Amino acid sequence: MKIVTFFILSLLSSLVTFAYAQKSFQVTVKGKGEPVYLFPGFGCTSDLWEETVAELSETHECHLFTFAGFGEVAPIEMPWFSTIKDDIIAYTKSKKINKPTLIGHSLGGTLSYWLAASEPELFRKVIAVDALPCSAALMIPDYNGDKIPYDNPRSQMMLQMDEAAFKGMNVQLVQFMCKNSEKHQTILQMMDKTDRKTYVYGYIDMLNLDLREDIANIKIPVIILAATFPDKATVEKTYQAQFAKLPGVTIHYAENAAHFVMYDQPEWFLQNIKQNLK
């Protein structure tokens, strides 16, 4: 009886730990080999990596993340972004995953920088896809570091936007961020499932994160696969400015590619991912 009781208590304990570790994300593991974490960009799910994982899972253990409020994953309370970061660190330590490589698109790439700067010894390498340490500096003219409150006129407008207007806004965004029109519907199907509060407040979390100084703490290799649309010279200038504190960063520029590099230049993208995982 004592053995049975001990077994049940141990099982319940493991279930509680498992649930806590993943409250801000859902993760699926595919393949065997050296561990790789794949983080999607804002509003996207792990489906973003379908073609990539079809190849990588043959040689690597791929941990596919979908964040809270995206796809079918239940939303969480704010702060959203920092909770995800802390939970991924806890997940890595509790599962004793040995130095995974971080691959992240957009917000997922920014998250990768944050993780590597926060825990310099926990990860092996960062491969970021069109991601900056400070998105606000790119998007807000004369950005001075001021924090954006959750409750502001623009966020209220977006929360009150009807579904048709919300989808219309996303259509315009996707047309700009992906040159491959055959993939537009794939992206929109992911974005349309996003919890609205997460979409609005989670984006504010991302804009309020400035890692331009923190990246100096990163001790592992950082490789960036950057888009070049709409203007390569401007893109290069932006990356050089934002990574001034990490001079050892390696940046590869994808010609004729917008933000969704994996869709606009799939062969180039996969070749660079596989090469940099060696």
Regions found by a protein language model. Name each.
Residues 1-37, 57-60, 98, 193, ...:
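Alpha/beta-hydrolase fold catalytic core
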Residues 29-74:
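Conserved HGGG/HGGXW glycine-rich cap/lid loop of the alpha/beta-hydrolase fold
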Residues 63-103, 107, 271:
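Active-site loop/oxyanion-hole signature of alpha/beta-hydrolase fold enzymes
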Residues 98-140:
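Conserved hydrolase catalytic core segment
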Residues 126-161:
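Flexible "cap/lid" loop of the alpha/beta hydrolase fold
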Residues 185-211:
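Hydrophobic, aromatic-rich cap/lid helix
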Residues 222-257:
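Conserved loop-alpha-helix segment in the C-terminal half of the alpha/beta-hydrolase fold
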Residues 257-266, 270:
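Catalytic histidine-centered segment of alpha/beta-hydrolase-like enzymes
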